[in-house]
Amino acid sequence: MQQVKKVVLAYSGGVDTSVCIPYLKKEYGVSEVVTFVADLGQGEDLELIRQKALNSGASQSIVGNLVNSFVERYAFPAIRANALYLDKYPLSTALARPLIAENLVNIAREISADAVAHGCTGKGNDQVRFDLAINALGPDLKIITPAREWNMSREEAIEYGEKFGIPAPVSKKSPYSIDVNLLGRSIEAGILEDPMKEAPEDIFAMTSSIENSPDSPQEVEIIFKNGFPVGINDESLTPVEIIKKANVLAGEHGFGRIDMIEDRVVGIKSREIYETPGLLLLIKAHKELESITLNPDVVDFKGIVEKKWGQLVYQGFWFGPLKDSLDSFISSTQTAVNGRVKIRLHKGNAIVIGRMSENNSLYREDLATYSEEDVFNHSLAEGFIYMWGMSNKIWAELNSKTKD
């Protein structure tokens, strides 16, 4: 097997990726480890993380600002797709992985690296997402996965890193595994591994508890153009600004917490806690606007597409041909999704209280009203019902005779 000399490592500054640096050098004989730190709006001191990579033995550490790309190319398409895995999880973490993988491959090309590496364990979903994306974009590149191969527990990984002078970012008494980006936070491990234990309040950072959220409700209007959110409360905003503002508005009122049992790609069930206030709010508003601007059969079929889209992204097939085809269908439905949705935020709830589309609404008050302005032709109903139920009536008559 050809000796790997230069590796690009996806680096977060956490236990697993920090330990990967000396491990790659010692166990694989790698001479150069170049780390890539993705800025996804997580709010961390990325320069400090970059320096930690260098102190841990990296020959070079690159920080990439991916925030705009993350929102425009990944989060916004997910909003158009009303993406909710298992009808709950808006893929806040899953959406980030193909973007990071794309940049790993690009950097590997630029610096003529032999391989790319990541610190995902063998039990999680992210290993699948990284590997599938890297194989799709750089099928010639070798993928090295130290954390999947060394089979160390978190405690053992911390001890291994300490031998090489690598400080652990979490103590052995604080076992939570937390992933953060602009779209939200995911929390797992520790006490959360017991599905009957309530998630402690101190694990949440983006959302208020019901007790601490405002007693007075707040109404917000979200504006859409071609299925993309473009403003909040009559204020035009950039995509990143929209996510940030939606996070603050929804999070303040305690909306956006998810506590679920999740079906992982590797075949096990896991208990996951998510905070995704802004993304959930925007998806809820978008779905509501579609109800007034899309035909019933389009809404119905798009629901099937949305479920499959969410599954594909969750399972790591962002760069797959089926996902591309579903993107084309979803995009074709969104030219009519223009308008605004009014939502009341209060004590963990986001309640739709209004929706309108000036030029694309399929709702006609003169047809729906029961007042004297009603223009619906009631006399046509009897014939319609007769034809609509014809097959069922014939079936009933036949089966009635059979029983006799």
Curated annotation (Swiss-Prot):
Amino-acid positions noted as binding L-aspartate in the UniProt annotation, renumbered to this chain: T121, N125, D126
Any one GO BP annotation for this protein: argininosuccinate metabolic process
Protein name as catalogued: Argininosuccinate synthase
Gene that encodes it: argG
Any one cellular-component term (Gene Ontology): cytoplasm
CDD domains (alphabetical): ASS (cd01999)
Natural source organism: Prochlorococcus marinus (strain MIT 9301)
Cross-referenced InterPro entries: Arginosuc_syn_C (IPR048268), Arginosuc_syn_N (IPR048267), Arginosuc_synth (IPR001518), Arginosuc_synth_CS (IPR018223), Arginosuc_synth_type_1_subfam (IPR023434), AS_cat/multimer_dom_body (IPR024074), Rossmann-like_a/b/a_fold (IPR014729)
Catalytic reaction annotation: L-citrulline + L-aspartate + ATP = 2-(N(omega)-L-arginino)succinate + AMP + diphosphate + H(+)
Annotated compartments: Cytoplasm
Pathway membership, UniProt: Amino-acid biosynthesis; L-arginine biosynthesis; L-arginine from L-ornithine and carbamoyl phosphate: step 2/3
